[in-house]
C-alpha cells in the first residue's frame, strides 16, 4: 500500500497537494501544526478539508514553542501584515524562521511511524517571495539530512515547486477541486477564508493567479501539464 503524509495548512497550496495525493496514493495522512499562529481559524479549516477530501487521518501537532522563538507578523499581533511583500533583496516580515525545517522534520517522523513513503509539501520556488525555506535546494538538503538521521528512505515531494500560481489553480481544476479550493481554503494573512481580505500579499498572489488562469484556461492548463508530467 502506498502511503503519504501531507503537510497541511488548509490553504490553497496544501489543499491542492492533498487533492492530488488522494489520486496518487492509497492512503493519505495530514499533519497540521499549531504554532500559535495569528489566525487560528486555519486549524479548523484544515480539519474540515482533510475530512472532506478523505484523508485517512488528520493530526494536529502542538509546536507552540516556535511562537516563542520566531518573531513574525504571522505570530505577533503587534506586527502589522504588509499589503505587499518586499522585493527579493529582503525577507518579508511574514517569514517564520525555522517553520519549514520543523514542519518537514516532524512530518517525516510521523511518516516513519505510519510507514509512509513520502512527505508532501506545497512550497513553491516559482512564486518565491523571499522565504529561504521554500527553495528546492533547501528541501532536498533537509530531505537528505532527515533520511540519514532516521536511516530511512522517505521522499520529500514538492508538486508545486516549479509551477506558478495560475498553474496551481489549473492543477486544482485538473483534480476537480477548483471551487472547493477557491471557496473553502484559507490563504489570507489576515485570516479570511475564500477570496480573503483582497489586499495582503497572499491574497494578491492568489487573486492574480486565479484571474490569469480563468482568462487563459487552455494555455495555462497545457503549461501545467507539461511542467508536472500529467496527461
Swiss-Prot record:
Protein's UniProt keywords contain Zinc: yes
Instruction: Show the InterPro entries listed in the entry.
Output: QueC, Rossmann-like_a/b/a_fold
GO biological process terms on file: queuosine biosynthetic process
Residues involved in Zn(2+) binding: 188, 197, 200, 203
EC number(s): the record gives 6.3.4.20
What keywords would UniProt list here? ATP-binding, Ligase, Metal-binding, Nucleotide-binding, Queuosine biosynthesis, Zinc
Reaction equation(s) it catalyzes: 7-carboxy-7-deazaguanine + NH4(+) + ATP = 7-cyano-7-deazaguanine + ADP + phosphate + H2O + H(+)
Task: Supply the Gene3D superfamilies for this chain.
Answer: HUPs
Give a short account of what the protein does: Catalyzes the ATP-dependent conversion of 7-carboxy-7-deazaguanine (CDG) to 7-cyano-7-deazaguanine (preQ(0)).
So what family is this one in? Answer: Belongs to the QueC family.
Q: What is this protein called?
A: 7-cyano-7-deazaguanine synthase
Amino acid at each position: 500500500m502506498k502511503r503519504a503524509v501531507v503537510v497541511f495548512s488548509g490553504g490553497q497550496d496544501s489543499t491542492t497537494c492533498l487533492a492530488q495525493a488522494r489520486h496518487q496514493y492509497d492512503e493519505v495522512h495530514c499533519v497540521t501544526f499549531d504554532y500559535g499562529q495569528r489566525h487560528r481559524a486555519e486549524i479548523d479549516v484544515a480539519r474540515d478539508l482533510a475530512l472532506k477530501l478523505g484523508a485517512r487521518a488528520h493530526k494536529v501537532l502542538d509546536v507552540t514553542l516556535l511562537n516563542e522563538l520566531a518573531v513574525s507578523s504571522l505570530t505577533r499581533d503587534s506586527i502589522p501584515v504588509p499589503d505587499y511583500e518586499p522585493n527579493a533583496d529582503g525577507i518579508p516580515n511574514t517569514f517564520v524562521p525555522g517553520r519549514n525545517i520543523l514542519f518537514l522534520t516532524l512530518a517525516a517522523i510521523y511518516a516513519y511511524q505510519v510507514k509512509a513513503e513520502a512527505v508532501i509539501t506545497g512550497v513553491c520556488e516559482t512564486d518565491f517571495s523571499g522565504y529561504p525555506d521554500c527553495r528546492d535546494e533547501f528541501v532536498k538538503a533537509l530531505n537528505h539530512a532527515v533520511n540519514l538521521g532516521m536511516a530511512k528512505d522517505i521522499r520529500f515531494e514538492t508538486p508545486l515547486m516549479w509551477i506558478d500560481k495560475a498553474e496551481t489553480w489549473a492543477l486544482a481544476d485538473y483534480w476537480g477541486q477548483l471551487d472547493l479550493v477557491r471557496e473553502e481554503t484559507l490563504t489570507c494573512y489576515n485570516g479570511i477564508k475564500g477570496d480573503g481580505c483582497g489586499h495582503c500579499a497572499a491574497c494578491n498572489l492568489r487573486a492574480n493567479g486565479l484571474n490569469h488562469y480563468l482568462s487563459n484556461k487552455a494555455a495555462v492548463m497545457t503549461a501545467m501539464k507539461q511542467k508536472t508530467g500529467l496527461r
